[in-house]
């Protein structure tokens, strides 16, 4: 398990429906279901963000392989990016708290962005 504290309630850990994961606070697009994959950690795992500015990154003290990630729009804390720990060589693993995400099913993206 990762060094993050596990709080439980990770509703998106085994959630693999097509769609987009957005920030729970501001609805900014963060991750596509295409980048989500099964991982042994208790948190949802993604390989990449939707936009280059979907998240902001801050080095994790005493952990050169980890970066704290926050929403690139509102600064809401999301979790961590673990460098070179993705499913393929050279990919990152974004380990994200379900409580920081909302899921928008495929085909409803426009309605979700208009509602914000």
From Swiss-Prot:
One of its GO terms (biological process) is innate immune response. The keyword Membrane does not apply. It comes from the Eukaryota. It catalyses: L-methionyl-[protein] + [thioredoxin]-disulfide + H2O = L-methionyl-(R)-S-oxide-[protein] + [thioredoxin]-dithiol; [thioredoxin]-disulfide + L-methionine + H2O = L-methionine (R)-S-oxide + [thioredoxin]-dithiol. The active site is at residue 95. Truncated MSRB1/SEPX1 proteins produced by failed UGA/Sec decoding are ubiquitinated by the CRL2(FEM1C) E3 ubiquitin-protein ligase complex. Gene3D superfamilies: Peptide methionine sulfoxide reductase. GO terms for molecular function: actin binding; L-methionine-(R)-S-oxide reductase activity; peptide-methionine (R)-S-oxide reductase activity; zinc ion binding. Keywords: Cytoplasm, Cytoskeleton, Immunity, Innate immunity, Metal-binding, Nucleus, Oxidoreductase, Selenocysteine, Ubl conjugation, Zinc. It is found in: Cytoplasm; Nucleus; Cytoplasm, Cytoskeleton. Its cofactor is Zn(2+). Residues 1-106 form the MsrB domain. Its EC number is 1.8.4.12, 1.8.4.14. It holds the Pfam family SelR. Binds 1 zinc ion per subunit. InterPro entries: Met_Sox_Rdtase_MsrB_dom (IPR002579), MsrB_Met_sulfoxide_reductase (IPR052150), Mss4-like_sf (IPR011057). Zn(2+) binds at residues 23, 26, 71, 74. It is an enzyme of class 1 (oxidoreductase). The keyword DNA damage does not apply. GO terms for cellular component: cytoplasm; cytoskeleton; nucleus. Methionine-sulfoxide reductase that specifically reduces methionine (R)-sulfoxide back to methionine. While in many cases, methionine oxidation is the result of random oxidation following oxidative stress, methionine oxidation is also a post-translational modification that takes place on specific residue. Acts as a regulator of actin assembly by reducing methionine (R)-sulfoxide mediated by MICALs (MICAL1, MICAL2 or MICAL3) on actin, thereby promoting filament repolymerization. Plays a role in innate immunity by reducing oxidized actin, leading to actin repolymerization in macrophages. Belongs to the MsrB Met sulfoxide reductase family. This is Methionine-R-sulfoxide reductase B1. It comes from Mus musculus.
């Amino acid at each position: 398990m990762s060094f993050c504290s596990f709080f439980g309630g990770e509703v998106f850990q085994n959630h693999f429906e097509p769609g987009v994961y957005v920030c729970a606070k501001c609805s900014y697009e963060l991750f596509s279901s295409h980048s989500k994959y099964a991982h042994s950690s208790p948190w949802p795992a993604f390989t990449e963000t939707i936009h280059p500015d979907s998240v902001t990154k801050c080095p994790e003290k005493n952990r050169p392989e980890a970066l704290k990630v926050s929403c690139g729009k509102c600064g809401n804390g999301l979790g961590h990016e673990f460098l070179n720990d993705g499913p393929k060589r050279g990919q990152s693993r974004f380990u994200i708290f379900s409580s920081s995400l909302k899921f928008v099913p495929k085909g409803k993206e426009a309605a979700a962005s208009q509602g914000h």
